[in-house]
């Protein structure tokens, strides 16, 4: 469990660093607003994933949670560090498009991997689901 937690944290810090370096060099015309509620939610999600996911005996779940935490951590640091809010340098569409950043991509892809890994783990260990803890 401790090794999975260490892997999760290492992946999260690596992905957050990639996101922050990208945000510092990319020009961004769009920004998320700075809200304390968003910072609290992101911090809570990061803590919950770091505490709970390593209890699952799945390395893929730890990797997925690490990627998702990296995205959340990247947005959290951006939210706290940049006065204009979270920069969104990536844009799809010109006037009515979607603006996002690498942290958003990391959070979504990490969540997809985490949910897939938990589903596969649940199917593989379905015989244990009825047992008392």
Segments and roles (model prediction):
Residues 1-133:
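Alpha-helical transmembrane bundles and membrane-interface segments of multipass inner-membrane proteins
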